[in-house]
Amino acid sequence: MMLLAAAEARQLPVLAICFGIQSLNVYRGGTLIQDVETEVKDSLKHMQGDLFWRRSHSINITEDSLIAKLAESTHTTVNSHHHQAIDIVGRDLEPIAWAPDGVIEAVVNTRADQFILGVQWHPEVGWQNDLLSQAIFNHFITVARERSSAGVAATASADR
């Protein structure tokens, strides 16, 4: 939570993965489903064990959202390795992707002052062969570079 607070105070870009999206949601005042398998009616198997690197379920993505643009689609499949998930969405977060059982799979920050993308799956696993994972990381790196350049320019101006 301290890292999220520090990133927010400095308006640093955040890419929150798996436990990260859950932590982000709680930090923003939201709540979690504690056990998807027992608390979500007709839940998919979100905890894949040793096979978590394999794509295990589809997600539906909000049209024109960041993930839809990066995926170039409103549907894709993702890996899955979690038993908790977002329940009540935290302030200034907007869900943009869901599993077929209704579990939230991605959120974005609705405030323009800070880039935040949270995903419930693991784009860092198997990214070498996954175009969406590559697009997520490339976009995050671009945003971070732009933020860094803007921060350097602002610091240089303040030093004059």
Go through the PLM ranges and name each one.
Residues 1-10, 37-160:
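Amide-donor transfer/coupling interface in amidating biosynthetic enzymes
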Residues 4-31:
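Catalytic nucleophile loop
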Residues 34:
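Class I SAM-dependent methyltransferase SAM-binding "motif I" and its flanking Rossmann-like core
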